[in-house]
Amino acid sequence: MSRSLKKGPFVDHHLLAKVEKAVAIKDKKPVKTWSRRSTILPEFIGVTIAVHNGKQHVPVYVTDQMVGHKLGEFALTRTFKGHPADKKAKR
């Protein structure tokens, strides 16, 4: 179920302040955040945000097609190592 339009998109205040500061001084360093739940706003376009995936910060360069999605969608938390090999096929 999507969020109500009258509420508007959710963005953590500390993340919004960091991004606005980075845009104002044209800083190219990634903005570090643990806020995977924040929605990407048009103000974030062109900024690199380092999103925490539980182990490390994954750099995410925000483009116009990402607006409206959550930051956590672009920093995967699970690594797929592949299915175990079939023991019958090895014989």
From Swiss-Prot:
It comes from Leptothrix cholodnii (strain ATCC 51168 / LMG 8142 / SP-6) (Leptothrix discophora (strain SP-6)). Protein S19 forms a complex with S13 that binds strongly to the 16S ribosomal RNA. This is Small ribosomal subunit protein uS19. One of its GO terms (biological process) is translation. GO terms for molecular function: rRNA binding; structural constituent of ribosome. Signal peptide: none annotated. Pfam families: Ribosomal_S19. InterPro entries: Ribosomal_uS19 (IPR002222), Ribosomal_uS19_bac-type (IPR005732), Ribosomal_uS19_CS (IPR020934), Ribosomal_uS19_SF (IPR023575). Disulfide bonds: none annotated. The gene is rpsS. GO terms for cellular component: cytoplasm; small ribosomal subunit. Belongs to the universal ribosomal protein uS19 family.
